[in-house]
Amino acid sequence: MSVSVIVDGIKLTLNPFMSTLTGNVVSAIAGSLKTQEGKKFEFVMRGEELQLFVDDQEIPLSLGQARRIVGNVFRGLLSSLHGAETGTEFRFIFEP
C-alpha cells in the first residue's frame, strides 16, 4: 500500500500511523462514494473545491453534501500534519 499527501507540490513525510490512517480514510471514502475499482485513488482539494480521480480519470462528485463532508474529513487529517498549515492545494493519493 502506498500513501502520499502532497501540499502545494511538496510531498509530506508521514509516520506509519498517519500513513495507515490516511490510506484507510481515502479507501473508505472512495468506496462510500461507490467509485469504480482502481489501482490509484487521488483526491485533490483546493479551498472548497474537491476532485476525485481513479486511475487518473476524474470521477464527478455531484453530491454537494458528500463533497462538504469529505472536505471536512480531509481538513481534519490535515490539521494534524506538520507542513500542511499554509497550503492551498492538497493531494491525497492512495495506491492499494
What are these regions (language model features)?
Residues 1-96:
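Conserved mixed alpha/beta catalytic, RNA-binding, or beta-rich assembly cores of soluble enzyme
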